[in-house]
Amino acid sequence: MKTFTPKPADLTHDWYIIDAKDVVLGRLSVAAANLLRGKNKPSFAPHADSGNYVIIINADKIALTGDKMDKELYSHSGRPGGLRRDSYAELLKNKPERIIMHAVKGMLPKNKLAKVQLTRLRVFAGEEHPHVGQNPQVYEIEQISQQAK
């Protein structure tokens, strides 16, 4: 039996929407990374771009476990003295999208295909998003934070 290799014409990019309210950051990131890579499809191949578009809403209501609120997210501009350190509590208040983008980026493979797949991730702080016309399918994450109960 021959191995099936998906052709670019066979690949479709579906739209999914995930509500991040009271969902733990790691579980949300795993689900988003798997959808972005297309691992939910039977035609998945690690070298082919079979991923989906993922919309994450309510990024400002995400749950962080442990002492992550005190930890810092580091980024560097590449210039001397360009190190930025922002605490998760500060980012959750000002730019909650950056927390999710950073977590999902870390769960994608480190290659050129991941850059393309990451462009299909759309993160919004509130419930409003401009992608209603794409009719995204709702993707449920069963486990929510224990702190929300």
UniProtKB/Swiss-Prot annotation:
Record InterPro entries: Ribosomal_uL13, Ribosomal_uL13_bac-type, Ribosomal_uL13_sf
Molecular function as annotated in GO: mRNA binding; structural constituent of ribosome
Gene Ontology, cellular component aspect: cytosolic large ribosomal subunit
Listed GO biological process terms: negative regulation of translation; translation
Keyword Ribosomal protein: yes
Secretion signal, residue range per the UniProt entry: none
CDD domains: Ribosomal_L13 (cd00392)
Keywords: Ribonucleoprotein, Ribosomal protein
Gene3D superfamilies in UniProt: Ribosomal protein L13
Keyword Translocase tagged: no
A matching Pfam family: Ribosomal_L13
Origin: domain of life: Bacteria
Assembly, per entry: Part of the 50S ribosomal subunit.
UniProt xrefs under NCBIfam families: rplM_bact (TIGR01066)
HAMAP family the UniProt entry points to: Ribosomal_uL13
Family: Belongs to the universal ribosomal protein uL13 family.
Function noted in UniProt: This protein is one of the early assembly proteins of the 50S ribosomal subunit, although it is not seen to bind rRNA by itself. It is important during the early stages of 50S assembly.
Protein's name according to its UniProt entry: Large ribosomal subunit protein uL13
Lineage: Bacteria, Bacillati, Actinomycetota, Actinomycetes, Bifidobacteriales
